[in-house]
């Protein structure tokens, strides 16, 4: 189904992602993000409400075992359209071909006359097509407009019991430490939700590239590519489990990433979806290029650590990718199946570029990484605010509420390459 412009409660999908991220879900689950990502769109919502039900009186010093957590995958490009806009319009332009010369009389490669532009009695273009039109022939830009709309919303909250906590602790300092611990842990919950949102945005994009491979050719089976290059027939299990094979595979992987990074700088039709537009019998294609400083690379970190001695000097230098445009992940979707993804993505309808549909389920066991244009994956922060209630006069507690509204955006017309092992 298409993503709609009304706010969508994304609590369930965010919470499911948090449970997978933290190992609460014992195995990887299929995540349906078909109405989560705006293609242009995507977003998540989550917010468990935690209430302190019981408190224990302490006889000694209390230690607050809480430390601040920082969300992963902050490499994703972020924008801020604000609360009063839930649609982003993106306009690109199709490539237009060169035109025939009007400055010469021309022939084709067989010697046959194409256009006679200079001849006695000929005027500007009014010669039955024998000459080219006048200089006033129009050649307007051919635009492509996409709207990335929608809003995913969720709240979070925490309750602080003021009198009870003051009774439970021996001093204002202990009370302050306890309240601070509550707030830090709630902040950690919010950071986990933020990470879940970012992770879901990334997972939808990765699965979408695979699902659209027939039109973008951007999902590369590195096992098949390695075997084709080396003239071997190793399986993924053999490569990952045999040190000699793995060392050679890593060298091939680094080489491949360097080549692909160079290819993305070329203005071409490769590695993205180009919805063809036909005007007057002429087909127009959308060409893209991604300079080095606009490329981002996310890799499965344990594989990258094995390859680090080679990858660092070979890939990350001023001539290739900048290190700040790289991030490693310890797992893609579930800590218990770190290299796997299982997603039903939201993708554009290639038969109707104005529509968004649910794609086919994508289940891959060994994903290595994704190399992409920074504009291909974005998170639109529309609202992020918090408010505190007054103290409840009878029961002496207060609530703090957080409100979130975001939109996750995947643009498959921008360059992006998925690297996996089949």
Task: Name each model feature, range by range.
Residues 1-70, 309-422:
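Extended, compositionally biased alpha-helical segments that mediate assembly or anchoring
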Residues 28-42, 46-47, 121-131, 219-225, ...:
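Mature, Sec-exported extracytoplasmic domains of Gram-positive
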Residues 235-373:
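Extended oligomerization regions of viral-like shell subunits
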């Amino acid at each position: 189904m298409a993503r709609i412009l009304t706010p969508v409660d994304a609590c369930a999908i965010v919470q499911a992602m948090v449970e997978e991220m933290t190992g609460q879900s014992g195995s990887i689950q299929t995540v349906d993000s078909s109405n989560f990502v705006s293609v242009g769109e995507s977003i998540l919502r989550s917010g468990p409400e935690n209430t302190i039900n019981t408190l224990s009186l302490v006889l000694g010093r209390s230690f607050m075992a809480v430390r601040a957590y920082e969300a992963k995958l902050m490499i994703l490009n972020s924008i801020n359209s604000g609360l009063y806009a839930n649609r982003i319009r993106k306009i690109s332009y199709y490539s237009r071909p060169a035109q025939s010369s009007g400055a010469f009389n021309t022939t084709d490669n067989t010697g046959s006359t194409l256009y006679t532009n200079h001849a006695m009695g000929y005027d500007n273009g009014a010669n039955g097509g024998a000459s080219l039109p006048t200089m006033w022939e129009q050649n307007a830009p051919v635009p492509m407009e996409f709207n990335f709309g929608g809003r995913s919303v969720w709240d979070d909250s925490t309750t602080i019991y003021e009198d009870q906590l003051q009774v439970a602790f021996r001093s204002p300092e202990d009370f302050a430490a306890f309240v601070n611990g509550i707030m830090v842990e709630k902040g950690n919950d919010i950071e986990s939700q933020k990470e879940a949102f970012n992770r879901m945005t990334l997972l939808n994009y990765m699965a979408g590239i695979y699902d659209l491979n027939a039109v973008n050719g951007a999902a590369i089976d590195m096992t098949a590519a390695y075997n084709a290059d080396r003239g071997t027939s190793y399986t993924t299990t053999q490569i990952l489990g045999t040190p000699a094979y793995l060392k050679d595979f890593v060298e091939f992987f680094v080489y491949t990433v360097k080549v692909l990074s160079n290819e993305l700088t070329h203005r071409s039709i490769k590695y993205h979806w180009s919805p063809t537009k036909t005007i007057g019998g002429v087909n127009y294609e959308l060409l893209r290029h991604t300079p080095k400083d606009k490329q981002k690379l996310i890799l499965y970190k344990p594989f990258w650590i094995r390859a680090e001695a080679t990858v660092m000097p070979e890939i990350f230098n001023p001539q290739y990718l900048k290190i700040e445009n790289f991030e490693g992940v310890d797992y893609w979707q579930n800590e218990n199946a770190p290299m796997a993804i299982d997603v039903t993505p939201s993708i554009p309808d290639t038969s109707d570029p104005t529509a968004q549909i649910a794609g086919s389920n994508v289940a891959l066991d060994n994903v290595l990484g994704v190399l992409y244009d920074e504009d291909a994956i974005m998170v639109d922060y529309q609202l992020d605010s918090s408010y505190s209630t007054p103290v409840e006069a009878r029961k002496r507690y207060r609530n703090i509420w957080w409100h979130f509204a975001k939109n996750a955006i995947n643009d498959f017309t921008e360059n992006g390459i998925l690297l996996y092992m089949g």
